[in-house]
Amino acid sequence: MKFFLDTANVEAIRAINELGVVDGVTTNPSIISREGRDFETVIKEICEIVDGPISAEVTGLTAEEMIAEARSIAKWHDNVVVKIPMTTEGLKATNVLSQEGIKTNVTLIFTVSQGLMAMKAGATYISPFIGRLEDIGADPYQLISDLRGIIDLYGFQAEIIAASIRTAAHVEAVAQLGAHIATIPDPLFAKMTEHPLTTNGLKTFMEDWASFKQ
């Protein structure tokens, strides 16, 4: 399984990348806006830090607008993946872009049919949202399982990016269900390395060693 960082905070990306567990980065307009910096500059900086797919999202609403934006964004770096919303216009754009060899990540997937349509249109990645489905009482894990089953059954080349990840339990569950990738907010990365028993165990080791050295 691959781990992507779901952030545009360059310093956080640089720090977490040193752990050797980051395979890519995802961003969206909300994440970019929180940084208060130029979109293109931020994406290019991220591409210099992480050697893997870096998702950058279009903001146009029509297929024509998305295609024009995507062509421009794709020129920023070879690792850039253009994020496209799961809409009818988004599917039109994905179809054109896939034929041009531009990698796409179709986002805001909440149903099997949406995922299937995105894959048929040529999406490189599809992003079902875990936390947001839980918010409305739906089962995100069944969605991941169903999408992975369809990929395996029909041989689609798309990879599943489990998004809207909020807890370590989310990561563990989607890993067990076969999601290819989990995209994880930077604060959660730190929490995934921690456990009270680990902390207490290390403390005990150090205390015992200090007593022995005396």
From Swiss-Prot:
Q: Which CDD domains match?
A: Transaldolase_FSA
One GO biological process from the UniProt record? pentose-phosphate shunt
PANTHER family, A to Z: TRANSALDOLASE (PTHR10683:SF36)
Q: Reaction catalysed?
A: D-sedoheptulose 7-phosphate + D-glyceraldehyde 3-phosphate = D-erythrose 4-phosphate + beta-D-fructose 6-phosphate
**Molecular functions (GO terms):** aldehyde-lyase activity; transaldolase activity
Where does the UniProt annotation locate this protein?
Cytoplasm
The entry assigns this protein to a family as follows: Belongs to the transaldolase family. Type 3B subfamily.
Pathway annotation: Carbohydrate degradation; pentose phosphate pathway; D-glyceraldehyde 3-phosphate and beta-D-fructose 6-phosphate from D-ribose 5-phosphate and D-xylulose 5-phosphate (non-oxidative stage): step 2/3
Name the domain of life this protein comes from: Bacteria
Q: What is this protein called?
A: Probable transaldolase
Q: Taxonomically, what lineage is the organism?
A: Bacteria, Bacillati, Bacillota, Bacilli, Lactobacillales
Question: Record keywords: Transferase included?
Answer: yes
Role this protein plays: Transaldolase is important for the balance of metabolites in the pentose-phosphate pathway.
Which EC numbers characterise this protein's activity in its record? 2.2.1.2
Entry annotation: catalytic residues: 83 (schiff-base intermediate with substrate)
User: What is this enzyme's class at the first EC digit?
Assistant: transferase
Q: Which GO terms describe its cellular component?
A: cytoplasm
Could you say which residues form the signal peptide? none
Coiled-coil-forming residues are: none
Sorted UniProt keywords: Cytoplasm, Pentose shunt, Schiff base, Transferase
